[in-house]
Amino acid sequence: METGLPFAFKQETRKLMGEQLWKVLSDNIDEPPVTSVRLNMPKCGNLRIVTTVAHSPVAWCRNSYYVEKRPNFTLDPLMHAGAYYVQEASSMFVEYCLDYALETLRKDGLESPSLVLDLCAAPGGKSLILRDTLPASCLLFSNEPIRQRANILAENIIKHGNPDVVVTNNYA
């Protein structure tokens, strides 16, 4: 299958991955991307949105679904109202990791964090997951060093409706 990737890249990747994994990659790289969404439960608790947008659940992230056919999200007022967030399923894995970390802290007799920093937060998917997963008493700072991206981050955080997130635009 022709992937449009540079020949040298394909050769090196094939060598690193081995023939079996390379075949899986090359067979799937030209497939249309899979779309997924994360529901904002306080805004769509009745789950009616699941039947209109979502298809099958993302295994590692609560309230997340694959979309069978990608709609025109920019025309959907529910998306603009923050009822759901369009997000790549692999980036939702942060919820699974955070759940594990919080459970480990609990088992070790340590307190949950009271302050968390998302250092490069735009466009906001990770921050939204962090805010939904962290204890209510935890304050989240979502920083984005690039001004234009920080504006998008702020807009997405506002849409989601969490007042306990501070959006900043700072370099380390």
Predicted region positions:
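S-adenosylmethionine
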Residues: 1-172
